[in-house]
Amino acid sequence: MVSSFTSAPRSGFYYFAQGWKLVSQPGIRRFVILPLLVNILLMGGAFWWLFTQLDVWIPTLMSYVPDWLQWLSYLLWPLAVISVLLVFGYFFSTIANWIAAPFNGLLAEQLEARLTGATPPDTGIFGIMKDVPRIMKREWQKFAWYLPRAIVLLILYLIPGIGQTVAPVLWFLFSAWMLAIQYCDYPFDNHKVPFKEMRTALRTRKITNMQFGALTSLFTMIPLLNLFIMPVAVCGATAMWVDCYRDKHAMWR
């Protein structure tokens, strides 16, 4: 099926919605199974454990609130919960993406071929195995870019007042951008586009990518829905690649 997508500007919300539609397309579902299983096992177990710990972690986090802000505690408590969900959700989402990276790349490749009618390179289990070292190197590049920035934001959580008010907002914006990078990178990497060049390309449509990443981040925090978010986000990001970036960066057509 050749895509009916156009180059007309679309919002990140549109591409996120497209991900939910594309993930169930005939011929694509079989490439969704492995990423979906990885996400269900890891995110399902992680969030079950998280919800058993919230009654311990939230009071600890609230203990950093200074006395002069105690009158706002009824507002800060939900922010503290959201903060924990954001950090925890992104952390385990990153682990799940590491484990499923080769299969996410294959899903992006097959969906792109279906949307465009292009012929991808010959792939299969041996092709995936051959690409694993390169794919893991790319994941390390993303992690190296992410880690120092995440550490700075996590330190902000320890500053009384700021940690319970400003830090959650900054973390949400950061995680939105990082999740856009994470999922958009699969089709870019399939075409051997360097990591730095990929980030530069995403910045040309920063609002679209922030919208896409923000919705992905929100759904990562929602129990049950977060079990399906990885393949959905891969499909949505691939649709965005086809519309917005493929003409300039594609290696195979």
From Swiss-Prot:
Compartment(s) where it occurs, according to its Swiss-Prot or TrEMBL record: Cell inner membrane
List the membrane topology term(s): Multi-pass membrane protein
Name the GO cellular-component terms. plasma membrane
Keyword annotations? Amino-acid biosynthesis, Cell inner membrane, Cell membrane, Cysteine biosynthesis, Membrane, Sulfate transport, Transmembrane, Transmembrane helix, Transport
Q: Main site of residence?
A: membrane
Q: Which domain of life is it from?
A: Bacteria
Q: Which GO terms describe its biological process?
A: cysteine biosynthetic process; sulfate assimilation
Among Pfam families, the record links this protein to: EI24
Entry's transmembrane regions: 31-51, 75-95, 151-171, 222-242
Known InterPro entries for this protein? CysZ_sulfate_transptr, Sulfate_CysZ
State any single GO MF term: high-affinity sulfate:proton symporter activity
Matches recorded under HAMAP family: CysZ
Query: Which family does this protein fall into?
Result: Belongs to the CysZ family.
Say what the protein does: High affinity, high specificity proton-dependent sulfate transporter, which mediates sulfate uptake. Provides the sulfur source for the cysteine synthesis pathway.
Q: Which NCBIfam families match?
A: PRK04949.1
Question: Which PANTHER family would you find in this protein's record?
Answer: SULFATE TRANSPORTER CYSZ (PTHR37468:SF1)
Q: What is this protein called?
A: Sulfate transporter CysZ
